[in-house]
Amino acid sequence: MAYYIVRAKPKPDRLNELKERLGRHAFVQMRPFGQALTRALNDARIQADGTAIWEEEDYCSPPLAEERAAVLDTYFEGITVERVQEGEGWKQIANLPRLGETNISEASY
């Protein structure tokens, strides 16, 4: 299994829907990635420029192929990944505000 830091620009017109679906655990049953994706998105952070950032575990090549097709491309654009050791991504972003607690229109672009 590999771990990645994921950076992506949330689509502002879809962010409330994403928050609502995460609140209903709508992605948890998606196999094989639903639980990990739900955990990661619930803990995602937001950078000052409005970029969402989180650590994700993944088995796919290319990384996040299934997650992008099923969920991520609906809610984010400009998705990039960088390989990290497990937990290192979360350490790097621990002090950033949570995506779910941020009004995306307040973030500076």
Regions flagged by a language model, labelled:
Residues 33, 77-91:
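Conserved short beta-strand edge segments in small beta-sheet-based binding/regulatory domains
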Residues 1-52, 57-70, 90-109:
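Short S/T/G/P-rich N-terminal loop/turn motif that feeds into the first structured element of a domain
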